[in-house]
Amino acid sequence: MQTAKKFKPHAAPAKRLTLSVIIPCYNEADTIEPMLERVEEIGLADEIVIVDDGSTDGTRDTLREIEAEARPNVHIFYHEHNQGKGAALVTGFSHASCEIFLIQDADMEYDPRDYPILLKPLQEGIAKVVYGSRFLGGPRKAMNFWNMIANKILTLTTNILYNAIISDMETGYKVFRSDVVRDMVIHAHSFDFEPEFTAKVLKQGIRIYEVPISYNGREWSEGKKITWTDGFVALWTLIKYRFVD
């Protein structure tokens, strides 16, 4: 008589993978320091890389003050003029040195308290890329209707073009092994980073792992920067990278 095999849980990697949190910012004078404090309070980042993308509202003054405090794991870089979120992220990637990269927007829409659930699949070795989804049941502030519709269209387009099943392509919480992006040529300068990165990850044959996150979206009156024209650019980006590299 055969005995039932005992279930063996998935073995975690022998050591914890190190984490770089990359924060692109543009005109976030009111939020950059509180966001940095939130990231530091979580205590999971081995280094924090902030890239100021040509801010003109006093953000740089705040960052200079942070630099003067000589926080050893905080590294700040500056663009002389505004180039866009994608360009700021490329700069951040080039200066980050850890095994996992986590993108953290500076606008307080995404909560660093979600880091443990975002990092778990990577630390357990069951994923190379993790997206935090705003549509998997986590607490969230109601989104603008047209923003939600645009997101659904872009996500559906992604799934059709790249044979994927994801729920939130445009999420700001993208976390991944650093080797995923090391040899990736990113052309995006603005919010088209999201579709370009997603397209190139899926074309590598990497399956995206999703986890539920919280979300506290801003209104345009509060400084939200993405516009309806970015949606058309994102759609074109998805179509373009389906056929070219």
Residue ranges and their predicted role:
Residues 79-95, 100, 112-191, 216-239:
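Acceptor/aglycone-binding surface of glycosyltransferases and processive sugar-polymer synthases
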Residues 1-40:
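N-proximal low-complexity "stem/linker" segments adjacent to membrane-targeting elements
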Residues 52-61, 108:
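A conserved acidic beta->alpha catalytic loop
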Residues 180-184, 190-207:
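A short, conserved alpha-helix in the catalytic core of glycosyltransferases
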